Amino acid sequence: MNLYLSLDLLPTALQENTFVYELYNGNNERISSGNFSDKREGDIITLAENEIVTSNVSIYTLYIYIDGNRDNPISMTNQNFRFNIYGEGTGAIYKENVIQNETTTPSNSSSTFLNTEVLRNQIESITIEKTNVVPNDAKYSKDISSKQDGSVMLWYTDKDNNSLYEISIGSENGSVEANTNGSGMFAYLDNVSTLDLSGLDTSNMTSMSKMFYNSKSLTNIDTSGFDTTKVVNMFGMFSGCTNLKSLDLSNFDTSNVTNMEGVFQNDTNLKEIKLGDNFKTNKVTTMLAMFASCSSLKRVDLSNFDTSNVTTMQSMFYKCENLELLDLSSFKTNKVTNMYCMFAYCTSLKTINLTFFDTSKVTTMQSMFLFCKSIEMLDLSTFTTDGATNIMYMFDTCSSLKSLDIRNASFSSVSKNTSAFNVVNSNVVVYVKNDTEKEFIINTIKNIISDNVIVG
């Protein structure tokens, strides 16, 4: 391989000086040396010809001295210069273009962005550029590459003079690669409304935890170029994006994700979520609060969900106040232990298919249907309460309920059952397991017609 040095920035005061260079391999052996003088900006120096022949990744060290040598260099102040090293041929120099990890996980909008001086609440736009050349009008720039080799640069401008910055992130070859841990990467961006991340390479990311968390002004996120095949953690990924109205995740491959807790939690204006065939959930173990407080969501297609490894569905649809229909017939719940508040405050929910639910391992169903005041029929004929210890407020204020099938459950034997049927319609028809359960229901639902409690 041939190795070259491009003099991208060389002030006049340095142009007459003699520069000495030495190139060492990973064994600290000098493989090339020389000098140059009387050079101008844009000139190219050949550092080595056919000296680097290894096909493996190796570390080389280049020393450059001005009018001196390795043992006796001189120093000059206030003279800025920039060299660019590049190679041609087999074994050419490879730069990863990977963004460095945050040294501190962001905790609020006053946290800094990607280890720079910029605060997250000072940003109004973020653009992925196809170059790492910092423009002259940049107010600030920093090398944010993981290897600190200049392959990924961040800079900002303030073109409208509003003290909010336009952030640019660019790499040498036009592709910016995210690090494996993207936790909080674009979180707490109070003043950013649109994010086009089509130029961000996410193919090596394993964590997208809280990636866009509490970016309250976001109305659009372009994730069409995201490669999520290696991602394991999506905890709170879009949580708190309160102005987000739609999300197209049809390109997401989530076949390795284990944590989907709170992915869309508190996205109060989210009306549409598009999930493609590769949005797999077969490895997911927690869906706690996954859609909680998505209060504008009317429908969501979960027909491809495989929940066979999920252990908690606590508050999964909590306060989805506009949700009208839920078909969960594909859900496998044989490992679920917690259904606390799963559908609580789904006040518009009229139809729900739970006919394939296996609740044999569920210990708490407390407030499961609390304030589902629009639902008229609940077929829970597959529900058992063998492991249940808490059904408090389970059907509290299901005031429109006309038919309830609980023929395989033994609610009377559950120790914590306070207000389980509080404010339930007294005209409801209830299908129960035996006479013991019938008596329990008659004594529990105020003013219920005894003939409406049917055994078998």
Residue ranges and their predicted role:
Residues 94-456:
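Negatively charged
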Residues 23-24, 64, 128, 292:
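Short beta-strand element of the conserved SAM-dependent methyltransferase core
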Residues 34, 87-89, 223:
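Small side chains
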Residues 26-66, 150, 155-169:
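Extracellular adhesion/glycan-binding regions together with long Ser/Thr-
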Residues 1, 42, 50, 76-78, ...:
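Glycine-centered loop/turn motifs
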Residues 2-9, 47-94, 182, 186:
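C-terminal, structured domain-capping segment
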Residues 1-34:
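Surface-exposed interaction patch
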Residues 13-17, 77, 178:
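Short loop/turn segments at connectors of secondary-structure elements within structured domains
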